[in-house]
Regions:
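Accessory beta->alpha helical hairpin/"wing" motif in late/C-terminal subdomains of nucleic-acid enzymes
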Residues: 78-82
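Amphipathic alpha-helical dimerization/coiled-coil segments
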Residues: 84-110
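Basic amphipathic alpha-helical segments that dock to polyanions
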Residues: 47-54
C-alpha cells in the first residue's frame, strides 16, 4: 500500500481503534495489522507521531498505568473531541469511497 494512503488513513484508524476501548501502542499496531488482513504493517515510528499529534490536538488523552506483568504502559483513550473528529473523518472517507466506487463502476463498464 502506498505511503500517502497509509498516512492519510492513520488518524481515522487510530481514533476508531480507540473508540473500541483504551489501548497502548503495541496493541494498536497489532490491531491495525489484524483489521487490514496484514496489508498495513505499522511500526513505532509510524504510530507514535500520530498519537502525539492527536494528544496535542485534544483528540486522545494518555495516562501511565501498570500492565498485568507490572510494567508501566502508556494507555491512550479517545476524548469527546476525538469522537467528533472520528465522525467527521468517517463522513469524509465515505464521500471518497462513494466517489471512487462510482468512477470505478463507470470505468469497468466502459
Amino acid at each position: 500500500m502506498g505511503k500517502d494512503l497509509v498516512a492519510a488513513s492513520a488518524t481515522p484508524l487510530v481514533l476508531a481503534i480507540l473508540a473500541e476501548g483504551d489501548s497502548y501502542g503495541y496493541a494498536i499496531i497489532k490491531r491495525v495489522a489484524e483489521l487490514s488482513g496484514g496489508h498495513l504493517q505499522w511500526t513505532d515510528g509510524m504510530l507514535y507521531p500520530v498519537l502525539h499529534r492527536l494528544e496535542r490536538q485534544g483528540h486522545v488523552a494518555a495516562k501511565w498505568s501498570a500492565s498485568e506483568n507490572g510494567r508501566r504502559r502508556k494507555y491512550y483513550r479517545i476524548t469527546r473531541e476525538g469522537r467528533a473528529q472520528l465522525a467527521a473523518q468517517r463522513q469524509q472517507w465515505q464521500a471518497v469511497d462513494g466517489t471512487l466506487r462510482g468512477i470505478w463502476m463507470k470505468a469497468c463498464t466502459a
